[in-house]
Structures are given as C-alpha cells and as structure tokens.
C-alpha cells in the first residue's frame, strides 16, 4: 500500500511577486550587514582580555545577543511588509550612522581592516535605508496595513 504525502514548503522570503525591487535589495543588504557584524564581533572578541570580570561580560554579551535576535526578526518581517519592522530597522540604521559618525570624529578612522569593513557595512545599511524610503517601497508598506 502506497501512501502519498503532500507537503507544501515555502522557503521564499517574499511571498508576493509584487514586492518592489528596492525592498528586496534592502532586505538582502540588511541580512549581509547583520552577518558581517556577527563576524566582526567574533573577530573583535579575540582581542578582549579574558582575565576581566566575567559577570559584566556575560551580561553585555547576553544583551547584545538579544538585540541581534530582535534585529534579525525585524529584517525577516520586512519581507512580509510589516511597517513596524521598517520603522525599527530604519531607527537602528539611524543609530548606526550616528554612532559611526561620532566614532569617526572622536577617534578617527583607523587602518585596521575591521574598522574599514564596519564603515563599509554602515554605508551599505544607509543605502538600504534609503531604498526603504522610496515612493514604491512606502506605497507597498502602506498597502500591507490591514
């Protein structure tokens, strides 16, 4: 006896074909930037002295991990057209821009590869944020409000 199983798996980030290309590009850029941040953080972690107190370090890492999970969730919700996710991601992009500009004026640009990659990542996030603010993207997000 043969049993036929029917399963429909949908692994596509964009369920609709109506998603503007600017939103698709912005989501891809944000995923890449988040991945680059995780790698940069891992590389910077190697330079920390582990003789320091562990309780504050665990607290900071736990808080950062929570923020990263929420950021990943917000990026995933962008592809579904959630306006709140767009606002959260735009706010985090603005925060990254402000902190990067402050760091550049306070410390200057170091020639370390990790700093240059971070600057390029923030520039890419800025472009992605501008993609989310185009007229087509804004109209698409507003059309998703129920």
Q: What residue ranges belong to the model's regions?
A:
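Topology signature of small-to-medium multi-pass alpha-helical membrane proteins
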Residues: 1-146
């Amino acid at each position: 006896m043969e049993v036929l199983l029917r399963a429909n798996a949908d692994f596509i980030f964009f369920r609709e074909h109506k998603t503007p290309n600017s939103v698709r590009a912005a989501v891809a850029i944000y995923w890449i930037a988040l991945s680059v941040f995780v790698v940069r953080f891992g590389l910077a972690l190697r330079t920390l002295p582990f003789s320091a107190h562990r309780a504050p370090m665990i607290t900071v890492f736990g808080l950062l991990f929570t923020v990263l999970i929420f950021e990943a969730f917000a990026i995933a919700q962008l592809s579904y057209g959630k306006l709140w996710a767009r606002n959260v991601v735009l706010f985090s992009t603005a925060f990254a821009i402000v902190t990067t500009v402050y760091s550049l004026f306070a410390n200057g640009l170091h020639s370390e590869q990790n700093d240059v990659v971070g600057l390029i990542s923030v520039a890419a996030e800025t472009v992605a944020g501008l993609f989310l603010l185009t007229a087509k993207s804004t109209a698409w997000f507003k059309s998703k409000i129920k």
